[in-house]
Amino acid sequence: MISHQTIDNRGLAYATAIVEHIEADPARHAVEQAQERCQRWMKQAPSPDLLAWSTLLSRPWLEIKKSLLDLSEQGNRLRQNNPFCGVLSPQERWTIHRAFRSHET
């Protein structure tokens, strides 16, 4: 079974890769897409975490980045429900996932 710590570390690895993608795009299109996705999700099933993301996504990129990479429990919780799906390719996601498979027992 995979530990919560490993799940949190894997989530941080995904977030780090997402940040790298977003920073490579000066227009930050992925942030705009995440805002739209978050709005759709809020209409379907509002939650405190989506409300937090909705608020956060209206802030400057550096604040969003800081939250994505935040090592606190708040950061872990936000990463578990982040609206940046689709930023990483399937290959990138699997590479990260496989890197953490050795931590499963």
Where are these regions (language model features)?
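Alpha-helix initiation and N-capping motif
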Residues: 31, 35, 49-50, 61, ...
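Non-transmembrane "mature" sequence context
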Residues: 42-43, 61, 98
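The feature represents the first ordered module of a protein
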Residues: 3-56
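A general structural signal for well-ordered secondary-structure junctions
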Residues: 28, 47, 62-63, 74-75, ...
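Short, compact, well-ordered microdomains
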Residues: 66-105
